[in-house]
Amino acid sequence: YRDEVRPILANNWEATYFDFDEEKILGLARTAKELGIELLVLDDGWFGKRNSDTCSLGDWYVNKEKLPDGIAALAQKVNEAGVKFGLWFEPEMVSPDSDLYRAHPDWCIHIPGRERTECRNQLTLDLSRKEVCDYLIKTIGGILDQAEISYVKWDMNRHMTELGSAGLPPERQKEMPHRYMLGLYRVLEEIVSSHPDVLFESCSGGGGRFDAGMLYYMPQTWTSDDTDAVERLYIQYG
């Protein structure tokens, strides 16, 4: 997509927030088609028990109460409606109220004996650890393998605190932030290179990640969470 014209997209987030089901998403897809929109993105809330921002990050399996037929079936139906299908992830995060955190509380960035500071009810996964990266590659990559997904919104909605890793000895703790980025690049290299037909868009509370490393993997970046049409023109064009 580096040299391609990007599709016009619509995102369900501000239309539905967490309150959606399959029929509501399909209704948005049909309306998008009528308006000449080429891609519909299903944002936060499709996985785990995610009915608010208080839980389930890291549990990347479909919420069958909202989408009983699963992501692959929804993607197929959206494509049949005449628009492509995109999906939101926040892979680097984990909710304390999640199956992943309960199984692996040491997988988040933390310092033993210190309080784990939550932002937006979430913690940051420790991507300096190989097993954490392996989990993301297998889980996120598996979803993309199984469904007709044309776009991924890769979100990141908090800053890092308590910079420590349970996978490093005390004398190497200062390596953690650098090793985190190496781990993230490995995850992106595996997932992006395995899915060359998917458009990946970086997002971090808006445009918080305009760095060369992310731009290498993400040919599109969400510029700002300010969606006022006039203000957005000033933001995007300086």
PLM segments and residue spans:
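Active-site neighborhood of glycoside hydrolase catalytic domains
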Residues: 65-70, 76, 101-238
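Short intrinsically disordered, low-complexity coil segments enriched in acidic
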Residues: 1-4, 173
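Aromatic-lined carbohydrate-binding/catalytic grooves of carbohydrate-active enzymes
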Residues: 3-138, 151
